[in-house]
Amino acid sequence: MNTDIINIIDVLYVIYFMLPAYMANISGLVFGGGKPLDMGITLADGRRLIGDGVTWRGTAAGTFVGLVVGIIQGLLSGSIIIGVITGLLLGFGALMGDAAGSFIKRRLKIDRGRPAPILDQLDFVFGALILVSPIVVLPIDYIILIMLITLVLHLSANIIAYLLGMKDVWY
């Protein structure tokens, strides 16, 4: 990527690459509910390991959606196996990143639903990129671009959801 100017191809590429993670993250929220992933475990600090916001159903649904998006990308690119692997790693990684973010928030004594700027927006990105990194090595400028795009997309989606009455807060 030419660091002097971010071109539209780079932006579209990183969005396309991250689609399994983006869709998994959204799907985990939409299809979530039920038993929490941490099974109600409370640590010595008196706080839950992760909390009620990360569930088995959301994790399974999000991982499945990430896999399906990866399969579609694999079909489009002519490499189904790469699509399966990257879709699975990006999708599951996104959900594990979100769970890790919840774990960190609990340790920082931040209750569920309370904001943790940057962590709330990028935890799933870090999880996805870490899990996929053994097979896909992205240049640092693409990683930075992914973070910037994700921040904009996340904020935009939250504002729209707030304006539509789907969220109580704009962030």
From Swiss-Prot:
GO terms for molecular function: CDP-2,3-bis-(O-geranylgeranyl)-sn-glycerol synthase activity. One of its GO terms (cellular component) is plasma membrane. Keywords: Cell membrane, Lipid biosynthesis, Lipid metabolism, Magnesium, Membrane, Phospholipid biosynthesis, Phospholipid metabolism, Transferase, Transmembrane, Transmembrane helix. The keyword Chaperone does not apply. It holds the Pfam family CarS-like. It is found in: Cell membrane. Its main location: membrane. Pathway: Membrane lipid metabolism; glycerophospholipid metabolism. It catalyses: 2,3-bis-O-(geranylgeranyl)-sn-glycerol 1-phosphate + CTP + H(+) = CDP-2,3-bis-O-(geranylgeranyl)-sn-glycerol + diphosphate. InterPro entries: CarS, CarS_archaea. Its cofactor is Mg(2+). It comes from the Archaea. It is an enzyme of class 2 (transferase). GO terms for biological process: glycerophospholipid biosynthetic process. It is a multi-pass membrane protein. Its EC number is 2.7.7.67. The chain crosses the membrane at residues 11-31, 65-85, 129-149, 151-171. Belongs to the CDP-archaeol synthase family. Catalyzes the formation of CDP-2,3-bis-(O-geranylgeranyl)-sn-glycerol (CDP-archaeol) from 2,3-bis-(O-geranylgeranyl)-sn-glycerol 1-phosphate (DGGGP) and CTP. This reaction is the third ether-bond-formation step in the biosynthesis of archaeal membrane lipids. This is CDP-archaeol synthase. It comes from Methanothermobacter thermautotrophicus (strain ATCC 29096 / DSM 1053 / JCM 10044 / NBRC 100330 / Delta H).
